[in-house]
Curated annotation (Swiss-Prot):
One of its GO terms (biological process) is glucose 6-phosphate metabolic process. It comes from the Bacteria. This is Glucose-6-phosphate isomerase. It catalyses: alpha-D-glucose 6-phosphate = beta-D-fructose 6-phosphate. It is found in: Cytoplasm. InterPro entries: G6P_Isomerase, SIS_dom_sf, SIS_PGI_2. Catalyzes the reversible isomerization of glucose-6-phosphate to fructose-6-phosphate. One of its GO terms (molecular function) is glucose-6-phosphate isomerase activity. It holds the Pfam family PGI. Belongs to the GPI family. Pathway: Carbohydrate biosynthesis; gluconeogenesis; Carbohydrate degradation; glycolysis; D-glyceraldehyde 3-phosphate and glycerone phosphate from D-glucose: step 2/4.
């Protein structure tokens, strides 16, 4: 009902579609990651992939005319914690811009009572890290606070710093 009755400027599906077009055509981001933080949504990325890529994966418009813009991103993803141990390094520190859609339910259907708060903790930590990054100064302070050898710092810092400002 939200999609069909809400004005475009407040319509979440419309806004997400426009952001996707913006990243694809103006930032050259040819891919988009869908990252659900609930195991019951483990196939959501594949579901969304099929709908988006099949609908938008054409080089012509609805009148059959060739277009001169990118028509859709490559959609992929995994449940959050699976992805954290697979491809998040590329998203945080890689050379490619990978816009990400993080999804988490307010109320989970998972019967493990402490599972959802832990997933939400990871969910918020990842989105914050992508938005704000971690500076050299923060990494150095963390090492000092942990009592680690300052001599090892120079070898480690480049691998712990990430810029943030990732969509």
């Amino acid at each position: 009902k939200h999609f069909s009755t809400t004005a475009p400027e407040k319509n979440l599906p419309v806004l997400l579609a426009l952001i996707g077009i913006w990243y694809n055509n103006f930032f050259g981001a040819e891919t988009e990651a869908i990252l659900p933080y609930d195991q019951y949504m483990h196939r959501f990325a594949a579901y969304f992939q099929q709908g988006n890529m099949e609908s938008n994966g054409k080089y012509v418009d609805r009148n059959g005319n060739a277009v001169d813009y990118q028509t859709g991103p490559i959609i992929w993803g995994e449940p959050g914690t699976n992805g954290q141990h697979a491809f998040y390094q590329l998203i945080h520190q890689g050379t490619k811009m990978v816009p990400c859609d993080f999804i988490a339910p307010a109320i989970t259907q998972n019967p493990l009572s402490d599972h959802h708060p832990k997933l939400l903790s990871n969910f918020f930590a990842q989105t914050e890290a992508l938005a704000f990054g971690k500076s050299r100064e923060v990494v150095e302070q963390e090492y000092r606070d942990q009592g680690k050898d300052p001599a090892a710092l120079e070898h480690v810092v480049p691998f712990k710093v990430f810029e943030g400002n990732r969509p």
